[in-house]
Amino acid sequence: MKEMQKIKAIVKQIIFYLKIILSFFYTFLLYLKIVKPKIIVRMNGGISSQMHQYLLGRIFTEKGYIVAYDLTFYKYWAKDNNGHFERNFDILKAFPYLEFKQSNGIESMAYILRFADKTDYFDHEEEDVFLYNIKPPKFLGGYYHSPKEIWKDLFPKYFHVDPQILDNDSHSLYMEIEKNIHSVGIHIRRGDLAVHNNAYGRPADLDYFNKAILYICSKIENPFFYFFSDEPQWIEDELIEKLPIVDAQYKIVNKNGSDKGYMDLFLLANCSHLITSKGSFGKYGALLRDSKDKIVVLCDDPLEYGWKDRLQNPVYL
């Protein structure tokens, strides 16, 4: 058994070094202009992160550049920051009509070794204006504060809700929400954002959700709340009894696991109003069906203020 493990380890190491050699050869072909240069965008995270990264690539296809997406995250890690929840590559399940080119392993390695952007993570909330000046070959592997046209122009151009991709259970709930003009979606992100996170700050707390529900109740007659979360059991066991609602006023949506999170995104989008938490899932749900009549409640946190110009009717509490 130990001998077999050693052999496997040696073979894996040989394959790794072969990939490095081939990646250098690929880079040589690039310099000789035998292969065309492109921009490769790394994809990772859940469905909303994938949507963001897809739009980042579209900035450059709109300029006429070749763009491909690196999916190695989903091959070797595919977890949240805590390593607890699965992160699946779902964007083509949610939006099967998208034009999509995947980079191969040799290509990605060549770009990472030679053409990786060195400023791919930022602590500030300003737009990453340097994106306007990028030309291929380049590897983009971070989370960028993208230019405003991503949200104003590209988001509605590329992303549309199609209930036909839903399974039977989710489609039935989608139609129920569609008929309920007083529907309010509440997204509660737990998992790796249940505690303080450097990128997102402190998590949305009980006081925030109480204020948000009371605010909605002051604006809407007979609201009905649909709860969406990566930990629905926690909502039922720990949260519901502490909120200012009664049994007839809510439903905890527990139909879709991490393999169908994109279906929850469509269900959330179909709600008339939204209460969001930290992270981008709830905001992307709002953007998919945004309107001036749609109340979207957000945490009153400077880290969330970047959404002011992206949503039509944001409310900070």
Label every PLM stretch briefly:
Residues H52-F60:
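Short amphipathic alpha-helix
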Residues D80-F95, I235-V246, R310:
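Short, aromatic/basic amphipathic alpha-helical patches
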Residues I47, K219-C299, L303-G306:
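Donor-binding and catalytic core of enzymes assembling or modifying cell-surface/extracellular glycoconjugates
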Residues I34-I40, A78-I220:
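Secretory-pathway luminal glycosyltransferase catalytic domains
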Residues K2-I34:
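Short hydrophobic helices that act as membrane-entry/anchoring signals
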Residues K12, F16, Y305-L317:
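Leloir-type glycosyltransferase catalytic cores
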Residues M43-H52:
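A short, glycine/small-residue-rich beta-strand->loop->alpha-helix junction that serves as a flexible
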Residues V67-Y76:
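A short beta-strand-loop structural module common to alpha/beta enzyme folds
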